[in-house]
Swiss-Prot record:
Organism in which the protein naturally occurs: Prochlorococcus marinus (strain MIT 9301)
Purpose of the protein: Involved in the biosynthesis of the chorismate, which leads to the biosynthesis of aromatic amino acids. Catalyzes the reversible NADPH linked reduction of 3-dehydroshikimate (DHSA) to yield shikimate (SA).
The EC number(s) this enzyme carries: 1.1.1.25
UniProt record similarity statement: Belongs to the shikimate dehydrogenase family.
Catalytic activity: shikimate + NADP(+) = 3-dehydroshikimate + NADPH + H(+)
Coiled-coil ranges from the UniProt annotation: none
Designated name of the protein: Shikimate dehydrogenase (NADP(+))
Annotated residues for binding of shikimate: 19-21, 66, 91, 107, 231
Subunit annotation: Homodimer.
UniProt enzyme class: oxidoreductase
Sites where the protein binds NADP(+): 129-133, 229, 252
Gene that this polypeptide is encoded by: aroE
GO cellular component terms, A-Z: cytosol
Length: 286
């Protein structure tokens, strides 16, 4: 029950109305018996500094940061973890002993969670998209020791940014729907990860589309694991299509829950919740 002593943790971004984080985090707080609530706060770019400075002065114990603020929040933090610096993105904050924001990124651990036991070392992978989410995915694949990481994207500037970050650890390919080289990559891939928004429920007219179009996927075969970071709808059109091809599929819910567990541990100095507590709360909501 909320009382005058209840503290809070919030999600800051724009938009935030689609987020499932309040559902799973409040389930975790209830499981742990914490006098905490979690809710989402929409915040425009120009208000970010004001909002974060204001939250220091009230009973806020931590934050999640989502798009479009994951990079812009750097200048408002006094302590930043090595992984957040490496990825140039922050998704979790807490107030330190000096009442300043300490920051980390839990997306990497969230992404890896459903892949840990799949023995992907020395396997070949494709990352679709070159935006912010691709950075966590690529670093995760490097950590899992995959032998080949091919990135297929449309945006030259963001592809160039990935090369600055990861150098010769990745191969870049501009999107061409009739590109035979791309089809060879798809045919040999052991793992394909979609980091684009195509297929997301909130993406206008894109929910029933495949990333890069149907023709792009003509060489997909059943040995490939297909991982879609999108979690709403579940399953996405891509995962339904891939399952019909006989592929193992992974949806974004597992990543969402796993990164949420790591954020919770960061806020509470090490408290842990069983995976199923958050996962069941989300599935009941869906």
């Amino acid at each position: 029950m909320i009382s005058s002593k209840t503290s809070f943790i919030a999600l800051i971004g724009n938009p935030v109305s689609h987020s499932f984080s309040p559902i799973m985090q409040n389930a975790a707080f209830q499981y742990l018996g914490l006098d905490l609530i979690y809710f989402a706060i929409p915040c425009k770019d120009e208000d970010l500094e004001l909002v974060l400075n204001s939250l220091k002065k009230i009973n806020c114990k931590g934050l999640n940061i989502t798009i479009p603020h994951k990079e812009k929040v750097f200048n408002l933090c006094s302590e930043i973890s090595p992984i957040a610096r490496k990825l140039k993105a922050i998704n979790t904050l807490k107030l330190n002993s000096e009442n300043e924001w300490s920051a980390t990124n839990t997306d990497l651990e969230g992404f890896i969670y459903p892949l840990k036991n799949l023995n992907l070392a020395k396997k070949k992978s494709i990352v679709l998209g070159s935006g912010g989410a691709a950075k966590s995915v690529i670093q995760g694949l490097i950590n899992l020791n995959l032998s080949k990481i091919s990135v297929i994207g449309r945006n030259k500037s963001s592809l160039d940014e990935l090369i600055k970050n990861f150098g010769n650890q990745i191969e870049l390919h501009s999107f061409l729907s009739n590109d035979n080289q791309t089809q060879n990559l798809i045919e040999e891939a052991d793992l394909i990860i979609n980091t684009t928004p195509v297929g997301m429920k909130t993406a206008k007219n894109e929910m029933n589309l495949l990333p890069y179009g149907d023709y792009f996927w003509r060489s997909l075969n059943s040995k490939t694991i297909v991982y879609d970071l999108i979690y709403n709808p579940a399953p996405t059109h891509l995962l339904k299509f891939s399952a019909n091809k006989g592929c193992m599929t992974i949806d974004g819910l597992q990543m969402l829950v796993a990164q949420g567990l790591k954020s919770l541990s960061f806020w509470t100095n090490g408290l842990e919740v069983p995976f199923h507590i958050m996962n069941d709360a989300l599935k009941n909501h869906l």
